[in-house]
Amino acid sequence: MSCGRPPPDVDGMITLKVDNLTYRTSPDSLRRVFEKYGRVGDVYIPREPHTKAPRGFAFVRFHDRRDAQDAEAAMDGAELDGRELRVQVARYGRRDLPRSRQGEPRGRSRGGGYGRRSRSYGRRSRSPRRRHRSRSRGPSCSRSRSRSRYRGSRYSRSPYSRSPYSRSRYSRSPYSRSRYRESRYGGSHYSSSGYSNSRYSRYHSSRSHSKSGSSTSSRSASTSKSSSARRSKSSSVSRSRSRSRSSSMTRSPPRVSKRKSKSRSRSKRPPKSPEEEGQMSS
């Protein structure tokens, strides 16, 4: 029987399924091997619908059940074309098909029918996928729920806090970030055991002192720079003024006051005689 079309009538035959075939194995070679054990009614090798390549298994049908059992016992584990065959009796019978589809070529089932194998495997393959999808969706939902519970009920009682450290479990105010450190390391929980003066409080105090020292040093540097600039400006102004005064003194001759000239003229007169003095007194 050729492998391209189904047999005309397979009712009442015993079907053996032969697995682990090579692509080179033909229906004629299988018929020659299995005819040693009895009358063979049909040999069928399913092929892929698109590529027409063999699918790696075949169905061999016997008219007598004893012949089928003898062939199964002898050929199960035998080698053919370099492959070890696996032979077993098909468990499922042929499925009744409508009259309009009886002439169409279909894949055989394990029990001698054409078309039940592909449908049954399709149904079996679909159900695990659906289960797998439902299982994969389950953990994601549970994760999202667990995350929402973790964020909502346990930590975030205040609506504005985003980080879990600044929430109601660690700090009472929703906006303070530094209070987490104070409440955790220098609060009432650690004050009895002496953690308030530990390295954490020292670290934060040294950090605040360094910040304040840097700010004061920057301010003093800025004030010293401004005072030095003012001093340089005042010194330059005083120098310019002294230079202008010295230049004006060198250009203009010294002025003599009128009082000094009158006193000089009076002192230059000759002394009066005693006669003139007597006249002046009379």
Curated annotation (Swiss-Prot):
Supply the PROSITE patterns for this chain. Answer: RRM
Where is the chain membrane-spanning? none
Under the cellular component aspect of Gene Ontology, which terms does the record hold? Answer: cytosol; nuclear speck; nucleoplasm
The UniProt regions of compositional bias labelled Basic residues, in chain numbering, are 116-136, 144-154, 201-210, 256-271
Alphabetized UniProt keyword annotations:
Acetylation, mRNA processing, mRNA splicing, Nucleus, Phosphoprotein, RNA-binding
Q: Which residues carry this modification: Phosphoserine?
A: 2, 26, 156, 158, 171, 173, 196, 273
Cited Pfam families = RRM_1
* Cited SUPFAM superfamilies: RNA-binding domain, RBD (SSF54928)
What domain of life is recorded for the organism? Eukaryota
Assign the protein's first listed, main location to one coarse class: nucleus
User: What does the record list as GO biological process?
Assistant: mRNA processing; regulation of alternative mRNA splicing, via spliceosome; RNA splicing
Residue spans of biased composition, Basic and acidic residues class: 93-107
Q: Where is this region: Disordered?
A: 91-282
- Task of the protein: Involved in pre-mRNA alternative splicing.
Q: What is this protein called?
A: Serine/arginine-rich splicing factor 8
Q: Record the organism.
A: Homo sapiens
Phylogenetic placement of the source organism: Eukaryota, Metazoa, Chordata, Craniata, Vertebrata
Name of the coding gene: SRSF8
